[in-house]
Every structure is written in structure tokens, then in C-alpha cells.
């Protein structure tokens, strides 16, 4: 019955979208499709709504116990000082790359300036379709005024129609500040991503502080499948994978997907790789099956080494 449940859920979503359009509340709102029908059909606008701010939480598997409030704040601030995790940064870069192409406009990325942290790596961003030439990085000193300055910079950028997307790494935000960002996005038609290092122990979405963001996501890393490219060694990690949890969305329902990023060649070196089709430029998200549904790869027999009659090493399998 799962197929019928998904069909019924998509039908309900379309009916709800028609009703909202009929009431004039959100008719004709533009969106940024993720390119995965299962996700785009589930979201009320057929993708991430523009003229809106979306919240993306960075999961933390190290915090499995329930700490006190002070320990929770310390853990979040320590992670913020060390930088957001790779999964949420890569996921946001992939969304920014899609917005960069779809809206033909530059992307602004706001982050704290910390000596121990490096800036975003251009060649790595290109792997997710984000062109560094159209990326404006705003690094703000990580002092007591960082949050206020970062929120001001994000608000001003969201009001600018010439900006395709605004990413901001912000540790904490209250409801009033998030409403200002949402109002700025609605005024300028901007698309904002709030990247936050929320502790992983906040499994209950209701326990997280409320914001005015249109949607709230939580991103965590998944084991990647072995690389299937002929020019790469076997058993090398393949494309990045994420567990994308939609914790809440206006006019919609929570849901979880497992995604993989497919990069079929937008970097300049792929044409020289053996077995690569230099004419392919497609890249984007794709759904993958949960780990429990994928067949287990057979374990390769390891050779054992023994000594021959003359002291020479002999390898055999079995």
C-alpha cells in the first residue's frame, strides 16, 4: 500500500495548492525546484519557495545524550566556531548552484571570519555546480556583534532583486529577527538559506526554538556507494549522499528522503578522463534507496601470505 499512500499524499498536496491559489494567499509564487519529483511534488510550491527564508540544520551525531541547557549552548557554539559540517555545507552549495543557474544571478554566502577556519574551497564548490566566479563571500569578524551584523547583511541582500540566493551561517536567531528576514525576502523576492549548527539531540522538532522560516530541514551524511567511474580505484567513496529531513513546511507535511548528488561533468578536467563523455553536463539530486534495501556487496577474499620452502613469500586466497 505505500504506492497508494504516496499518490494520495501528492493528490492532497495539489488540492491544497489549488485551494491556496483560489484564496489568493500564495498564488503564483515562484520556486526553486530540487529536480526530484518526489520532493518537489511534496512541497506546496513545487520546490523551495522564493521570496522566503528556509532553515537548514546541521546534524551532530556526537550528541546522543540529553545534556543540560548550558552544555547544549556550549556544544553548539563550539561547533559553530569549528565551522559547519561538510554535509550541510555541500547540500547548501548544491542548492546555491541550482539557484545560480535558474535565476542567472550571483550567490552571497555570509560566514564568520575565524583564523582556524578556511574559506569555502572553489574547486570543491564547482563539484556541486556552484560557480565561484558568481559567488560573493562575506566574512564577518566572529566577535560579539557577529550575529547582528550577519542578520543585517542577510536582510539587505534578500531585498536586492539581483541576488539569486543568500546563504548565512548563523548560530542563533530569535523569532523577531527571522520575521525581519522573511519580510525582506518577500519584499525583494529573494531566496534565503539559514545554515545553523543545531545539536543532533534535538530530535523533537517541537523542542527547537520557533522561527518564521517557511521550511526547516535537517541534513546528515550517509555512507556513499562505491565509485563506479572507470578511472577511479575500486572501493573508493562515490557521490555524496544525505539524509534530508523536512521537519516542517508551511502548508505541507514533514517527510524524510535519502539523496545522492550526481555530478556528470561540469568541471573542466572531465573531458580528459578515460571513459568520460565530455558532452554530458547534467548534475543534480537523485533519490537513493535506504541502506537496508540495497544488496550487500560480497566481501572480497583476502590473500594470506605464507613462507615457501626457500623462505619466499607465497600468497593464496581462501
Kindly label every feature range from the protein language model.
Residues 176-200, 210:
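Conserved P-loop NTPase nucleotide-binding/switch module
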Residues 1-111, 120, 124-133, 248-252, ...:
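Detector for small/aliphatic-rich hydrophobic stretches
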Residues 117-122, 200-221:
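Glycine-rich, charge-decorated loop segments at or immediately adjacent to ligand/cofactor-binding or catalytic sites
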Residues 102-164, 176-178, 184-186:
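Conserved nucleotide-cofactor-binding alpha/beta core module
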Residues 210, 214-318:
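C-terminal functional extensions of proteins
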Residues 55, 108, 164-169, 193:
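Structural motif
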Residues 113-116, 172-174, 198-202, 250-251:
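Conserved nucleotide-binding/hydrolysis micro-motifs of P-loop NTPases
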Residues 110, 193-197, 220:
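Generic beta-sheet signal
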